[in-house]
Amino acid sequence: MAAITYWLGLQGFARRHHNIPFRRRIRDEQAPEYEGLSHRLKQLMQGQHLYRNPNLNLISLSAELGIPPYQLTQLLNDHFQQNFNDFVNTYRVEEAIRLSRDPAYAHLSLLGIAFEAGFNSKATFNRAVKKVTGKTPRELR
């Protein structure tokens, strides 16, 4: 028993730099299903403006789609190449840009527009705008 443990330890040490892929990718037979899901997800985000809900989270969005959270995470990572927060914040930044150019929202400060777009804090808004556009929020107005 000790010899097996010793041998396994040596094998592990010898292969410590080998990358072992552990993440499942969307298989070819799943691709049509994921195309449909991505279309439904875009419709929900654009049509119902779910991103404007500051309490939107992975669980509530996956429930809205009728899929388990892990499947939504896989869809976002593989199809959109984004994590959940980046995906939602991209919609929020686009909404904030649209609102900042709308005369009906001219009376709001940038922070007010951020809250209208679904952001919870100024810091998150600033960080997301910089990440999505490469500009600061003030440069957007």
Model-derived features: positions:
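Membrane-proximal linker segments that couple transmembrane helices to downstream signaling/catalytic modules
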Residues: 10-117, 124, 128-131, 135-139
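Alpha-helical membrane-embedded segments
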Residues: 1-11
